[in-house]
Amino acid sequence: MMDMKENDQKRNDMMDMKSHDERKNLNSSQGKNEITFPKVLDPKKDNNGYKSYTLKAQKGKTEFYKGNFSNTLGYNGNLLGPTLKLKKGDKVKIKLVNNLDENTTFHWHGLEIDGKVDGGPSQVIKPGKEKTIKFEVKQEAATLWYHPHPSPNTAKQVYNGLSGLLYIEDDKKNNYPSNYGKNDLPIIIQDKTFVSKKLNYTKTKDEDGTQGDTVLVNGKVDPKLTTKEGKIRLRLLNGSNARDLNLKLSNNQSFEYIASEGGHLEKTKKLKEINLAPSARKEIVIDLSKMKEDKVNLVDNDETVILPIINKEKSTNKDTTPKVDKKIKLEGMDDNVTINGKKFDPNRIDFTQKVNRKETWEIENVKDKMSGMKHPFHIHGTQFKVLSVDGKKPSEDMRGKKDVISLEPGQKAKIEVVFKNTGTYMFHCHILEHEDNGMMGQIKVTK
């Protein structure tokens, strides 16, 4: 029978296990930095029909944050590595060069090849040394990757940047997007922690799996993706050391799941969420043309933004309004309120307009140092049409003829204004106290 000390120890051990299973908080991407895509490494063809490549593991410097350079590792560059594109039946020769200060290997994750060239811990390449491997590609289309596998330094070397993608390309015609870097997009997701805005694996290492608080996509912090494409194919790689990812779209839109680690599914599936374990790959196709919005977020666990996706085609095509004829700036709070920097003067005419002339007015609720407040803007003697709000088509409840539009601080609207009668008319904020405090102007409509 266990004594109390043994029970306490067992309880403590269980608590330790529980704490190690908990996910470290991951901060959302702020969408500040446009992601780029790894270059495709072009092969040389030798006389024996081999596609010939050279990969160098090397040290580098990477500016994750402006003015702050981190010591990183990369293949043929400062961080990450180029994409290799192969096809079933290809004969491949790769010269592997170790320009690091420590042992490394080159492991071909998911590639079905002879164990002698798999790149496991027993196939070490020492600092300053190189070796050449050969193999034939015998498997179907898939998204694979390569990374170091030296014992006991795999985690450190991957965390510091040694990762790259290897495609076995589609060998049959399908309708999947296939233009690399345009609509066929490699997406390497990783999480890291920065100490004083610099990468430092030693200070953040966790023996039960190092998880970071900062998301990176293709080596960019605060990543975003801007595209004009209607459909995009994301080749997702969870390149994190330890973090599981549960990915979905923030608008709850479904996507087409087309491939797993081993290649294309026999039958694609419509899903709204997928799980990516560390090292896993999955391919999905997102139809951005079905979105009402011009932006959607790829999120983890319903909340953490991994990658904001901006549909440039939607956002650039929405504001097709004509040139602006008049500008109205609503400013202030309390009794310090103005239109175009002026308080109402009954002896002043602020604007003129011809009767039956169609004009475009731009109404802006200026956001000041105090943040401002919502202002409902009203025009006497006419009903106007809302053309756009912040450059986008107005919401359904703003359709139809209107004589008042309410704008939040910082919002800007364009409206179409036609007067059918002549005379002098007021325009003003319809918070009545603001109107009384001078947030009002006059327009004279003439023949």
From Swiss-Prot:
Cofactor(s) needed for function: Cu cation
Residues that, per the record, bind Cu cation 2: 109, 147, 430
SUPFAM superfamilies on file: Cupredoxins (SSF49503)
Binding site for Cu cation 4: 375, 429, 434, 439
EC number: 1.-.-.-
Cofactor binding mode and count: Binds 4 Cu cations per monomer.
Composition bias type Basic and acidic residues, residue spans: 1-25
Induction (free text): Induced by copper.
Annotated GO CC locations: cytoplasm
Keywords: Copper, Cytoplasm, Metal-binding, Oxidoreductase
The keyword RNA-binding is assigned to this record: no
Record-listed Cu cation 1 binding positions: 107, 378
Disordered as annotated region, ranges: 1-43
Family label: Belongs to the multicopper oxidase family.
General function of this protein: May be involved in copper homeostasis and oxidative stress response. Oxidizes the substrate 3,3'-dimethoxybenzidine in vitro. Also possesses low levels of phenoloxidase and ferroxidase activities.
Name this protein carries in UniProt: Multicopper oxidase mco
Organism: Staphylococcus aureus
